Design a protein with these regions (language model features):
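Autoinhibitory propeptides
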Residues: 2-98, 105-121, 388-390, 419, ...
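Short acidic, glycine-rich surface-loop motifs adjacent to enzyme active sites
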Residues: 63-68, 230-260, 283, 397
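Subtilisin-like serine protease catalytic core
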Residues: 87-224, 314, 325-326, 435-437, ...
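Extracellular S/T/G-rich loop segment that most often corresponds to the catalytic His/Ser-adjacent loop
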Residues: 126-128, 132-135, 139-148, 290-376, ...
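Hydrolase catalytic cores
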Residues: 176-179, 188, 199-209, 236-246, ...
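Catalytic cores of secreted or luminal carbohydrate-active enzymes
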Residues: 247-248, 265-295, 548-550
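Noncatalytic modules at the cell exterior or secretory-pathway interfaces
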Residues: 315-316, 382-398
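Edge beta-strands of jelly-roll/beta-sandwich modules across compartments, strongly enriched
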Residues: 399-411
Length: 558
């Protein structure tokens, strides 16, 4: 197998390496010459499996193993102040701006994605799922389709024969439509920035070995951190070629993270967010009522955490994050009463436990210092977990702050019958939305004015998040096969915010009102203009700084 085929081959493991300009560091760390450079900090290393089926027990740093991300499920123009802006002299429709979509693809045949002259709004489409010639693609796998190829397909009687890319789930199509969809007189729909151009990446599903590592049921759709980082790299590349300002939008997330914005994807996006003419927008997540977060503190006795596991749960991974310089230990008790005993280790290590009565296999990995967050982390992976109550007894060395957090996977990776019996709805923003430099948006119901019940809540330990909220309940948008329908979730409110960010880039860069505009400046403009309830204290763990309102933002600028 040639090295350039490593990205599409199942014969390789993938790792994320940091090299600080010296690529030999990555080659030496992973003992491979197969490297894809993302930027001056990150690269992806492809390591031949050589008969190995799993990365268990291979002693790679935890932050080098790609995380798995999932989708954030999914009279709006008036609610966010866009209709008022259109009625003003600002004339903002997204002209000259691009939006990069990293999701499930797009129905490029939908009329919502064609300009008035019939040309496509999609400037480039990279479908990671369609195998092509590695030499013909920018990053060595998948297939790229240009604007010209898409428009040629649209002229055909059978467009799919020329550009065979589909959005099977409709998630990406819906979000792209909220951002850039045309006005539809029959349904009354209009995207936020209908003149915006699109760069679309359809993510391929994570490789089997990675889903196995995180104990994710094969029936769930998961996406690898490496593919997402390369998608961002691709969007940057196309935007640079076209010399256009760009919004990068991600309607995906994960719970398995430090929740401090320290993961490779988090840091890579932070670097993009600081650039002039770039806005990075994320969805806060739908974990507010999922009962997937436990926050506790070790006192004189061990802290006891109860996890209820549902029937027929395939498996799951759970992470414990503590605070340095403390060292944490776990003792895990099965529903039948079998205990692992106190699991402890040195700098890092693994322990395998089989529960005989339950036929459950447990793999515990511990890292005294996580490379990226600098904090202790214990990763517990349950294979074929028995239903019932599992007890996690947490102890520590009693040094410094003795607080800790436990997170179960996101809703889309685990059944609704598996949760913490005592949980907290706070600090539930998914990665990368808990990253300080990015724009993070929660969700509210514009019909009732209330917070969406599932909207993830703040605050992370080191940031005020979410930044604000946007409508995200029963919102109208385009669906595959030229249809329209309604969806809910913070990916919806995030897409609305991404459209608003595109209008801000048009105002700043294309209309030359703020030539230094970037993610931070857009965020601060929108925070100043957010509507706030006088009965609430801000910043607020549920609402951030309020409800986003573009018109009020411009009233505050004048």
């Amino acid at each position: 197998m040639l090295c350039e085929n490593a990205a599409q081959s199942n014969d390789y493991f993938e790792f994320i390496g940091e090299y600080s300009g010296v690529l030999d560091y990555v080659k030496e760390e992973f003992n491979t010459e197969c490297i894809t450079v993302i930027d001056q900090r990150f690269a992806i290393a492809y390591v031949k499996k050589n008969g190995r089926t799993s990365i268990y027990g291979q002693n790679y740093p935890y932050n080098t193993i790609p995380r798995c991300f999932g989708l954030m499920d999914t009279q709006m123009l008036e609610d966010v102040g866009v209709a008022q802006v259109r009625r003003s002299t600002l004339d903002l429709y997204g002209n000259g701006v691009l939006v990069g979509m990293i999701d499930t693809g797009i129905d490029y045949e939908h009329p919502a994605f064609r300009y008035e002259d019939g040309s496509s709004k999609i400037y480039s489409l990279w479908d990671q799922t369609i195998e092509g010639d590695p030499e013909d693609t920018f990053l060595g796998y998948g297939t790229e389709y240009t604007k010209e190829q898409i428009e040629e397909a649209l002229k055909s009687d059978v467009p799919q024969q020329k550009v065979p890319s589909k959005d099977e789930s409709g998630h990406g199509t819906f979000l792209a439509g909220l951002i850039a969809g045309n006005e539809d007189n029959e349904t009354g729909f209009s995207g936020i920035a209908p003149n915006t151009g699109l760069i679309v990446v359809k993510l391929r599903k994570a490789k089997d070995y990675l889903k196995e590592y995180y104990c994710i049921d094969p029936k769930y759709e998961a996406y690898a951190e490496t593919d997402i980082m390369l998608a961002v790299h691709y969007i940057d590349h196309i935007a640079e070629q076209l010399q256009r300002p760009i919004v990068i939008f991600l309607g995906i997330g994960t719970n398995l993270a430090s929740h401090l914005g320290t993961g490779p994807l988090d840091q890579y996006l932070s670097g993009r967010a600081m650039l002039r003419g770039v806005a990075v927008v994320t969805s806060a997540g739908n974990e507010g009522q999922a009962r997937h977060h436990y926050s506790g503190q070790v006192s004189q006795n061990d802290a006891k955490v109860e996890v209820k596991v549902g029937e027929s749960e395939y498996g799951f991974a759970m992470e414990l994050w503590g605070l340095a310089p403390n060292r944490y230990y776990v003792d895990i008790e099965s529903p039948s009463g079998q205990k692992t005993g106190r699991i402890q280790g040195g700098l890092s290590g693994q322990r395998y436990v089989t529960f005989l009565l339950e036929k459950t296999r447990l793999i515990v990995e511990y890292f005294t210092v996580d490379t990226s967050a600098g904090a202790p982390v214990i990763v517990m992976r349950f294979q074929n977990p028995a239903p019932g109550i599992w007890n996690i007894y947490v102890s520590d060395d009693g040094v410094g702050n003795r607080e800790f957090d436990l997170w179960l996977p996101i809703t889309n990776f685990i059944s609704e019958d598996t949760f913490f019996l005592e949980s907290t709805p706070y600090n539930t923003l998914v990665a990368p939305s808990n990253t300080g430099l990015l724009i993070s948006c929660g969700s509210y119901n514009s019909s009732t004015g209330s917070l969406a019940i599932d909207s993830s809540r703040g605050f992370p330990r080191n940031a005020v998040k979410p930044d604000f909220t946007a409508p995200g309940v029963e919102i109208l948008g385009p669906l595959p096969r030229k249809r329209y329908g309604r969806k809910s979730g913070t990916s919806v409110s995030g897409a609305i915010t991404a459209g608003i960010a595109a209008l801000m880039l048009e105002w700043g860069i294309m209309q030359k009102n703020d030539m230094q505009i970037n993610t931070t400046r857009i965020k601060n403009y929108l925070i100043r203009g957010a509507r706030r309830d006088p009965e609430r204290i801000y910043p607020n763990r549920e609402w951030g700084y309020g409800q986003v309102d573009l018109y009020e933002t411009f009233l505050g600028i004048r």
